[in-house]
Regions:
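Surface-exposed interaction regions that form or flank ligand-binding interfaces
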Residues: 1-71, 80-82, 102-166
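Active-site beta-strand-loop-beta-strand hairpin of nuclease catalytic cores
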Residues: 78-98
Length: 166
């Protein structure tokens, strides 16, 4: 069951409106491709969740605030009384994880995921919900290689989604 649909970000809508009207700089073109790929990855995840629609409640593209902190949640699924927070990445290429951090990236998606999980848990507790929250980075693009990945990392690859929610 879908409770909130996904919409294009304001940034993506702006890029699409300008595309063809102006020539993007290299940096603008890179950012446009990044934002577009992210949205496409989120839509692909939505399609996968829709195939499980009878067992899943979906909330997409949420902006949450609690205790002066905010987070953007790509997808929140409720399955059998458990809440799954998914941060969706449509990355392509090779990446390495060492000691819980992505090598060579300035921002750490695992830290972002933990922060989002804390905010979701706080909001649920504040409104009287006592449910377990499981947070996962979902790498939706099959053209990704993750080196150094351990079972302790809260990471799902595309082929693991269906069995994970089993």
């Amino acid at each position: 069951m879908l409770l909130k649909s996904r919409e294009k970000s304001f940034e993506l809508v702006q890029f699409e409106a300008l595309r063809g009207r102006i020539v993007f700089s290299e940096e603008q073109e890179r950012l446009y491709k990044y934002v577009t790929a992210g949205f496409m990855g989120e839509c692909l995840c939505d399609e996968m969740a829709e195939s499980m629609a009878e067992r899943v409640i979906q909330l997409r593209d949420l902006l949450l605030a609690s205790g002066g902190r905010t987070c953007q949640v790509d997808s929140l699924l409720v399955v059998a009384g458990k809440v799954y927070l998914l941060e969706i990445k449509n990355w392509e290429g090779s990446f390495e994880i060492v000691d819980g951090r992505f090598v060579g990236l300035s921002a750490c998606p695992l830290a972002q995921l933990q922060r989002s999980k804390m905010i979701v848990e706080h909001l649920l507790r504040r409104y009287g919900f006592r449910v377990e929250v499981e947070a996962r980075l979902l790498f939706i693009n099959p053209k990704i290689s993750l080196y150094g990945l351990t079972r302790q990392e809260p990471v799902l690859l595309r082929h693991q989604v269906e069995p994970y929610f089993g």
